[in-house]
């Protein structure tokens, strides 16, 4: 009896909350539709797989940080290009005033439709971010970078003035405001951040990111990007080998790593990453310097194989799909079931056609000949 009274009291409270705050303000978790996490591809298959869900999750805060010239902006511009290719609207808040439109265009960004803001101070930048996110019309917004979000008081003050904690308070307030709006509008916010050294650290890493601790807490995904090797063509440097570590991940297991090539003037080499992943998972075979896929030669040396895949995008898509299917990343269960059902139906149709072919009567001419032969014998 007591249990029934408690259930009635709970139902009454839930009904009152819905009347006061609107439908969906509170619900039983089982009543929610379990939709797969929507993502934006990073441009690197290896990194999409390391993230566990096939890309950067929609409606979340993402932080990308690393040393100078490590590929932070390049990685972000690839995400911008992929969001636009999927029909999304993207905004870029260039607090550093350093975005190169020509380079962005080379990476596939539609600069004609990219919403760009170059604010004067940190308050203005984050106010613009808040207004754009609350419009509900964006799929992705990029802030480059947190370190360049200089508070108004610091800009208007003297050069030697101390402004301890101003930027951290600004970031904390902004993230409190926009996090809910990001989730409701399914907008991904990428904050690019820089590294600083903590003075007097004896043990552990002395590196830290700018903007206080708020971003560390509010970010669903944190990516640490580092340049690990210089790629050379003879004596000329043509790119960097880059490693990204998923330091924090609220949508999949963290601490996974991905490596890929960033080529100067071209960005992330998707085809090079597919070759590496294909060899690792047994889809692409390497014998000496030759790379082959299902008996077909891709080329001698990684560069030739990379160019072959670039010239044959359908083949590259096929290899990527097989890798993701094997690892169970980016494959929706309902889509997999639908595909299996379609395959089964196609197999049934084929079998029916074969049976029908077997029971087709002999042509009339042959039947006539057989009748004549029987008559002659008799």
From Swiss-Prot:
| SMART domains per the UniProt record, alphabetical | AAA
* Name of this protein: Protein RecA
Listed GO cellular component terms? Answer: cytosol
Q: Which gene encodes it?
A: recA
Q: Name one GO biological process term.
A: DNA repair
Q: Which domain of life is it from?
A: Bacteria
Q: Where in the cell is it found?
A: Cytoplasm
Q: What does this protein do?
A: Can catalyze the hydrolysis of ATP in the presence of single-stranded DNA, the ATP-dependent uptake of single-stranded DNA by duplex DNA, and the ATP-dependent hybridization of homologous single-stranded DNAs. It interacts with LexA causing its activation and leading to its autocatalytic cleavage.
What is the similarity comment for this entry?
Belongs to the RecA family.
Q: What SUPFAM superfamilies is this protein classified in? A: P-loop containing nucleoside triphosphate hydrolases, RecA protein, C-terminal domain
Keyword Zinc in record:
no
For region Disordered, the annotated ranges are 333-378
The UniProt entry, under Pfam families, shows: RecA, RecA_C
UniProt GO MF annotations? ATP binding; ATP hydrolysis activity; ATP-dependent DNA damage sensor activity; damaged DNA binding; single-stranded DNA binding
Say if the entry is tagged with keyword Nucleotide-binding: yes
Q: What organism is listed for this UniProt entry?
A: Streptomyces venezuelae (strain ATCC 10712 / CBS 650.69 / DSM 40230 / JCM 4526 / NBRC 13096 / PD 04745)
The UniProt record gives the binding positions of ATP as: 66-73
Q: Which CDD domains match?
A: RecA (cd00983)
Keywords, A to Z, come to: ATP-binding, Cytoplasm, DNA damage, DNA recombination, DNA repair, DNA-binding, Nucleotide-binding, SOS response
The biased composition feature labelled Low complexity covers 338-378
């Amino acid at each position: 009896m007591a249990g029934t009274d408690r259930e009635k009291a709970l139902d009454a409270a839930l009904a009152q909350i819905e009347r006061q705050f609107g439908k969906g303000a509170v619900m039983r978790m089982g009543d929610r539709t379990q939709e797969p996490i929507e993502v934006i591809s990073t441009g690197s298959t290896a990194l999409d797989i390391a993230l566990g869900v096939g890309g950067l999750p929609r409606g979340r805060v993402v932080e990308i940080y690393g040393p100078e010239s490590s590929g932070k902006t390049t990685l972000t511009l690839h995400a911008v290009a992929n969001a636009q290719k999927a029909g999304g609207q993207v905004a870029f808040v260039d607090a550093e005033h350093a975005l190169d439109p020509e380079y962005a265009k080379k990476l596939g960004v539609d600069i004609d439709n990219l919403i760009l803001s170059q604010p004067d101070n940190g308050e203005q930048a984050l106010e613009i971010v808040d207004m754009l996110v609350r419009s509900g019309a964006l799929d992705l917004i990029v802030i480059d970078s947190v370190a360049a979000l200089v508070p108004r008081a610091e800009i208007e003050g003297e050069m030697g003035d101390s402004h301890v904690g101003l930027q951290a308070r600004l970031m904390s307030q902004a993230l409190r405001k926009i996090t809910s709006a990001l989730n409701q509008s399914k907008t991904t916010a990428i904050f690019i951040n820089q590294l600083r050294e903590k003075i007097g650290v004896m043990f552990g890493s002395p590196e830290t990111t700018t903007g206080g601790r708020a971003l560390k807490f509010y970010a669903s995904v944190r990516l640490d990007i580092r340049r690990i090797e210089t790629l050379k063509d003879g004596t000329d440097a043509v790119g960097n080998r880059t490693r990204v570590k998923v330091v924090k991940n609220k949508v999949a297991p963290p601490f996974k790593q991905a490596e890929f090539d960033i080529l100067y003037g071209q960005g992330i080499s998707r085809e090079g990453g597919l070759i590496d992943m294909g060899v690792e998972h047994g889809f692409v075979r390497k014998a000496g310097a030759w790379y082959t896929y299902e008996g077909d030669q891709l080329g001698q040396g990684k560069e030739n194989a990379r160019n072959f895949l670039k010239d044959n995008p359908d083949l590259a898509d096929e290899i990527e799909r097989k890798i993701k299917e094997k690892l169970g990343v980016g494959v929706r269960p309902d889509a997999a079931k639908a595909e299996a059902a379609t395959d089964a139906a196609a197999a049934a149709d084929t079998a029916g056609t074969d049976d029908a072919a077997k029971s087709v009567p002999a042509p009339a001419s042959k039947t006539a000949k057989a009748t004549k032969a029987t008559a002659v014998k008799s």
